[in-house]
Each structure stands twice: as structure tokens, then as C-alpha cells.
Regions:
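Divalent cation-coordinating acidic motifs and surrounding scaffolds
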Residues: 2-257
């Protein structure tokens, strides 16, 4: 596992970019901690590249609406990647936009080997992050494959971490997990649904990769009670396509817990 940490001022990005059409801002005391967790194996790496290409948009929207937001990033492959790239690569929660940008630029594609991936390690590493007291806490898990120990033996969890145990631990810390499935594998759907249910999060199926960044923003806005405002902004900018609208309906219909 490779880990990077740090903290400066994410809000300096919004000051630099301006943005008169920024969404409504939450109370200055409201803190939001969110981690973006990505499968970087094979074609899944394209999703991280899409976030990389739109990182200015993502960071601007979040830090303008939630001045005390911190973001972390957890990239994961599989155990076979340990000798060539990484099993997990971690950026701790930070408000330093440049650090986030540099981290995502440096994350490499992994191979993955078999179908299950080291989701359990991504959950474990997320448990180790510096979550702040009194913050709204969310993890967004983006992937197309289940963790080890679902369709293979628990012995395949080479570092000894169990996805269900790690999920329950995250839930006890008040961290909601929003699981975003890419593709339609039934085993992935089943376990992603369970992960979200355990933590009072939401399971979502992503039909179009181009919707991912606005979905990430929408999840953050939901956490601080600004989802309706952000949806209206998308409508005003003619950016709310049918698949994106479907995702926002799923977010909006789920009661806050």
C-alpha cells in the first residue's frame, strides 16, 4: 500500500476559478469528509481518467458549496499487482486541491488478474483514514467486480481482511458507502447492494461513464442537503440527460438517515 497525506486549502481553487453560478453554500461549520474509491484494473481505469479530466469541475463545485470539505482517494487493483504497481494507493483526507490533482495524475493502471478485485483492501484502507469528528462522512466506491471472498474463498483475501467486517466497521463510524456499479455482473450487484445497506448508503448502477463526475458531486450535495439545488443547476445548464436524471432520482428518493 502506498499512502500520501497532507492538508492545505481546497477552497483556494474556488477563489481562483470564481464561479458566480456556484450552488448554495452550507453553514461555515459544516464539515464533509468524502473518499473517492476506484477500481483501476483494465477498462475501469478509464473512469478514473474521466475524473482526472474533470477534476477542476468536481473540486470547484464541492469546495464552493462546502468550504470545509476534505477529499481522499483510494485506488485499488488486486494482489497480483503488488510487485508491479500496487494493491492499494491511498491519499488521506485533505483540502489541498493540488495534492489531490497530483495524486490522481500519478495513479497507474493495474492488471487485476482474476475477476474479483481487492475491494476488501480498499475498504480496510478507508477505515484507516483521518475522519474528522463531527463531519458528514461518505465513501464512494466505483467498480465492476466483487471483493474476494464472495465468489472465491476467503483465503483469497491475502492480507486477512474481510469485506463484510470492514464494511461494518465503516458503518459504525457513521461512514455511508455509496456503491457505484459499472456493468451488470450479478455478484457485484449483490455485494455492492449489501455494502450500501450495511452503512445506510445507496447502491447505484452507472449506465454512462460521462455521468460519473456529476454523480460524485451530487452525492456530496446530498450529504449536506443541497441535492435539489445542484439538480436545478444541471437543468439550467442543460446538463441533465436521462441517465443522469435517473441517478439523481435514486439519490433524491432515498431518505436521509
Amino acid at each position: 500500500m502506498t499512502q500520501i497525506g497532507g492538508s492545505s486549502k481546497l477552497k483556494t481553487l474556488s477563489q481562483a476559478l470564481g464561479g458566480s453560478d456556484a450552488p448554495k453554500t452550507v453553514k461555515p461549520s459544516q464539515k464533509l469528509d468524502v473518499t473517492l474509491t476506484f477500481d483501476t484494473t483494465g477498462s475501469m481505469y478509464d473512469y478514473l481518467e474521466d475524473v482526472r479530466n474533470q477534476l477542476n469541475h468536481l473540486s470547484q463545485e464541492i469546495c464552493q458549496a462546502v468550504p470545509q470539505a476534505k477529499m481522499g482517494v483510494v485506488a485499488y487493483g488486486d494482489y497480483c499487482d503488488a510487485q508491479t504497481t500496487y494493491v492499494t494507493k491511498v491519499l488521506d483526507l485533505t483540502d489541498d486541491y493540488q495534492l489531490i490533482s497530483n495524486f490522481i495524475k500519478q495513479v497507474k493502471k493495474t492488471d487485476g488478474g482474476d475477476f474479483p478485485e481487492a475491494v476488501e483492501e480498499a475498504l480496510y484502507q478507508t477505515n484507516q483514514l483521518a475522519w474528522r469528528l463531527g463531519s458528514r462522512r461518505a465513501m464512494v466506491l466505483v467498480g465492476d467486480a466483487p471483493p474476494h471472498g464472495v465468489i472465491d474463498s476467503l483465503q483469497a483475501c491475502q492480507y486477512g481482511h474481510n469485506w463484510r467486517d470492514e464494511t461494518q466497521s465503516l458503518g459504525k463510524k457513521g461512514i455511508k458507502i455509496y456503491t457505484v456499479q459499472c456493468g451488470s455482473n450479478p455478484d457485484t450487484k449483490r455485494v455492492f447492494q449489501e455494502i450500501s445497506q450495511i452503512t445506510n448508503g445507496i447502491y447505484l448502477n452507472l449506465e454512462n461513464m460521462s455521468d460519473l463526475v456529476d454523480l460524485l458531486i451530487s452525492i456530496c450535495m446530498k450529504e449536506v442537503g443541497l441535492l435539489a439545488e445542484y439538480e436545478q443547476k444541471l437543468k439550467t445548464n442543460n446538463s441533465l440527460n436521462p441517465s443522469k436524471e435517473k441517478l439523481l432520482r435514486q439519490l433524491g428518493s432515498a431518505s436521509d438517515k
